[in-house]
Amino acid sequence: MSLSKETEVIFDEHRGVDYDSANPPLYDSSTFHQKVLGGNAKFDYARSGNPNRQLLEEKLAKLEGGQYAFAYASGIAAISAVLLTLKANDHVILPDDVYGGTFRLTEQILNRFDIQFTTVNATQPKEIERAIQPNTKLIYVETPSNPCFKITDIRAVAAIAKRHHLLLAVDNTFMTPLGQSPLALGADIVVHSATKFLGGHSDIIAGAAITNRKDVADALYLLQNGTGTALSAHDSWTLAKHLKTLPVRFKQSTSNAEKLVAFLKEREEIAEVYYPGNSSLHLSQANSGGAVIGFRLKDETKTQDFVDALTLPLVSVSLGGVETILSHPATMSHAAVPEDVRNERGITFGLFRLSVGLEQPQELIADLNYALKEAFNESIIESITEQRFSS
């Protein structure tokens, strides 16, 4: 029977075979008994394999429509694994507004190993193709990008990659496997910061890489095992449980985000609102606008005043939790990017990223409304309580 993704995250094919409990047991063990010396047992040492991680990886593979999945100790560990499948003098093409952690990884760490990187405007497939060199091996994109929500045409870039015999990796963190399926669009590898929507509760750090290619899978497993970056049994067990509620969480957060987008578009204090659901290209390759919004204040000198006046959002790094999280990319996710480069890429001091959670949307709107008025010195007539939380 072919199952929907919504059912797949709940159904456990090991139940009734390996155990009878509603949830799989936690195999909190570093090592496993070997009945036969040299007998090639399924599990021997937890870094190499664990039943909880195996179950999680099976679910992640099915969600992304892949044959192989690998769970890592963080999103950046998964990205590192993908890039470390390359060797010295190989060349990679990246978006010019790539996530700050990926920027730091490429600029300060991997360049020591003579892996070469070129950044381009990934919204223009022709620019990507022009950047290809004889030693290019990989095109790596984020779509939507973080934090300016630029959209890359996955089908077009996949066609370029195949024409030049290159690999294409797509960071699908913002959209989740429920909102976008890069492998089905022609990508070779999908990566996630599973800390975000897949985990959804801001209580674990995790990453994932999924592929249909056996050669890539072998390389990813070698790195997972050989560099010791595998996700722990406990975090694998926790993440597998959290995946069960991903469909309802992502659907509700997206619905809430759409309401906040409509509100922010009407505010005169806001210079720009960024939302993937406003892009026809995005909607041609995804079935959802997602639950993350970008917006820019008209007067960036009001940035701290705006933050000070907010009550409901968690002001923090990260995204994809059940709680609404307001992030300031210039001082958080992209702090590792030099200021002049940030400004050139539109990551200015007045830019915010809002990951919308499961709170009542009208209460979030009321809180944002109050904070904008307070920051921009508009008169407050109603009491704070009434203005923030009246329906």
Swiss-Prot record:
Disulfide bond entries: none
GO MF terms held by the record: cysteine-S-conjugate beta-lyase activity; pyridoxal phosphate binding
GO cellular component: cytoplasm
Alphabetical GO biological process terms: methionine biosynthetic process; transsulfuration
Keyword annotations from UniProtKB, A to Z: Amino-acid biosynthesis, Lyase, Methionine biosynthesis, Pyridoxal phosphate
pH dependence (record): Optimum pH is 8.5.
InterPro entries registered for this protein in UniProt: Cys/Met-Metab_PyrdxlP-dep_enz, Cys_met_metab_PP, PyrdxlP-dep_Trfase, PyrdxlP-dep_Trfase_major, PyrdxlP-dep_Trfase_small, Trans-sulfuration_enzyme
Sites bearing N6-(pyridoxal phosphate)lysine, chain numbering: 196
Essential cofactor(s): pyridoxal 5'-phosphate
SUPFAM superfamilies with a match to the protein in the record: PLP-dependent transferases
Pathway(s) where this gene product acts: Amino-acid biosynthesis; L-methionine biosynthesis via de novo pathway; L-homocysteine from L-cystathionine: step 1/1
Reaction catalysis annotation: L,L-cystathionine + H2O = L-homocysteine + pyruvate + NH4(+); an S-substituted L-cysteine + H2O = a thiol + pyruvate + NH4(+)
Complexes and interactors: Homotetramer.
Similarity field: Belongs to the trans-sulfuration enzymes family.
Name of the protein described by the UniProt record: Cystathionine beta-lyase MetC
Organism of origin: Staphylococcus haemolyticus (strain JCSC1435)
